[in-house]
């Protein structure tokens, strides 16, 4: 948990200049790469369609261990670009922020959880996929 604290502190303490026109990019060494099996397992466990998760992955285009800044001060982390606004909820479920960033399997599980959460909120897979990245256009 201590490593997760330092990771989050590093992300939030970057200079304001990092939030200029370009997105700041921070890269940490991956713990475990994302594989197709990771995505298949996440889909199976969450009950979400595997095709939806692969579509989100293709759209988000992140990398294991990589974080990209957003203009609102949040960060998108890992292959599925899970936004840091979800980290407290994930931590309450026992998922460390560092794992979401650096472990491809955990990132896929977090993405599947988020898609499932949006599906439960909207009742529509298409709306859930649309809301995955942002609820606002």
Predicted feature residues:
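Positively charged n-region of N-terminal signal peptides that target proteins for export
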Residues: 1-3
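Catalytic glycan-binding domains that act on GlcNAc-containing polysaccharides
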Residues: 21-137
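Bacterial N-terminal signal peptides
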Residues: 6-16
């Amino acid at each position: 948990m201590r490593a997760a604290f330092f990771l989050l502190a590093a992300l939030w303490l970057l200079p304001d200049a990092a939030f200029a026109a370009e997105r700041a990019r921070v890269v940490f060494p991956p713990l475990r790469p994302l594989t197709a099996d990771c995505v298949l397992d996440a889909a199976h466990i969450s009950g979400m369609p595997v095709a939806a998760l692969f579509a989100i992955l293709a759209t988000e285009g992140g990398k294991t261990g990589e974080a990209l800044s957003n203009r609102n001060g949040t960060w998108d982390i890992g292959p599925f670009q899970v936004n840091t606004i979800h980290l407290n909820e994930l931590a309450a479920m026992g998922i460390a922020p560092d794992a979401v960033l650096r472990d491809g399997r955990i990132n896929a599980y977090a993405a599947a959880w988020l898609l499932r959460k949006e599906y439960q909120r909207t009742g529509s897979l298409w709306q859930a996929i649309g809301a995955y990245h942002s609820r606002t256009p």
